[in-house]
């Protein structure tokens, strides 16, 4: 699957009328499928899509299309199914762009089976899997009305409820009703067919005057045919939310059971369905809750079995960000090589480089473009078991950050030029695609670097989120993660200046830290550390830091030394900077917390015992890279926290009805904020009142979010300019990129919105 920038669909013949009776155009169809993508994709993702196309409109002949054409875009997911007549490659529609392609093809109808493809462990090859749901097609015989269909539907529902299954109704957009039932455990298509047939036969026995389970058309007059056969692995059903190629643009529309009690029940048109989605969301939300909507890590996951390999295999969809880390891993596989990975759009774009990157400009080295890897892989070291994909030992050879000059990794004319800043390797490199997945890696001449050490332009080095449990003390040092505000401090022979992580001069905001000037009066130093306020147990408290007064005791805990008496230390190894820092602390009253004992697991347990926020692991040979988020520093927290940008607010209810009830959260992305959900828990009345006052001058009519919000979240909101940063605690990220069970921790005036990234 290609990157978002590679997935484009151009609408042609937009004004072409496809439904003459209503004047509905191809552009209308395009807009419809874009509008239903969020709710429809879960019900078709992972399944082979058969299309029924009306390129010249519904008043002209249509045709079914199964085989994916050679002209189909390369980013479209696909898989092959063996039939009696041969093999067929089907598209798998698992993205909004895929649905846009459906509309561009004038494929008004999308038909899918009740099973999904499953990946073979190791190879990642997709093969037909078991059924994940049942479907019953209630087909009315001559003279049967919708009220009779509804009566049979309720009988099916009650029969399935007796065996613990829930049922969801869908008006088919044609004449009948479809009933869907999610299966707690997938079963073979044959097993699903047998079960569905038994249900239909039992219903026929209970309601012989109204129901038939027999396919013979001559026996259907005045009855409802409960078609159980569409559960067969070789059959398909019109997908929920699909348009129908009839005179009017009706839709296979999910309904409520209450609606089936309405004598005036009828089929719905596409514009009615869009209105309902905006109001009600997806009525089939529980049908395909585990739908495997594809993302840039789909191929990576298919090639690995989480029960057999220690490699990180995240289930959540990667979130686009602007991180710029790189890692080179020494991979002792069957064919030893190096893996070069660049963080890009929420994943690690990866190449296997047999001879590593060249160390001079006179040679080129082969690089093989491989599957995107998760960001967590940047800190992975370990042994992949024999028999698994990529079996062998993986060791981090180098890591750091990079600057981008050019980044085009499209399937045809790829070219990437980056400037690496690592511990063992640095400089400008070009990777140029030559044929397919084969690239050439070339070292370029460096442009003159005129950077000098200036405190006013200095930004703190940042850590990547990861797990420290497998890290060894021989290579890593472990510090406590303190729940305070990050500060850079310059003390110059009796004068002191403080700068926040965002670059603001905050010297006046910390009168309690003026003593640093006297403590370090004999030196000119630049320190990196944390301003903390301790609770009664001696543990840094973010809440007390937030609500501190001028008389509150604030301490500065130093953890890095960047400059000492005329010598810049940015290029010095961490373990050497640490020794200098400890020497400085021994000669002054500077507070330098001790390193945590043992390997990563022991350090993590120690920090938990003391009630600290977590652990920061730092490679002992790492250099300090200002303003960069690097894999050579890893943070691992005992609870999940996330910085967010406030993009709007919703009025409260009850006691909060006159003010802010909850805040809309976002993570900055290329097109605006990426919606991350709402937070209201943990906000005190005082904080709510202060927030309302702070947000008032930021009100705007324009949404700061990159896509329209779901209907349930967009109701009754006031948008604001994305200027305020906050921090929340949460239980997990959902597959849709939302924070689950979020609770408020406080504003982060020390952070800029542009600095916020998904942890």
UniProtKB/Swiss-Prot annotation:
In the N-terminal section; belongs to the LigD polymerase family. In the central section; belongs to the LigD 3'-phosphoesterase family. Its EC number is 6.5.1.1. Monomer. Component of the NHEJ repair enzyme with mKu. It is an enzyme of class 6 (ligase). It comes from Mycobacterium tuberculosis (strain CDC 1551 / Oshkosh). The keyword DNA repair applies. Residues 297-446 are annotated as: 3-phosphoesterase domain (PE). The active site is at 481 (n6-amp-lysine intermediate). This is Multifunctional non-homologous end joining DNA repair protein LigD. Mn(2+) 2 binds at residues 137, 139, 227. Residues 13-16, 26, 53-55, 63-67, 71, 83-88, 104, 137, 215-220, 227-235 bind DNA. Residues 9-261 are annotated as: DNA repair polymerase domain (Pol).
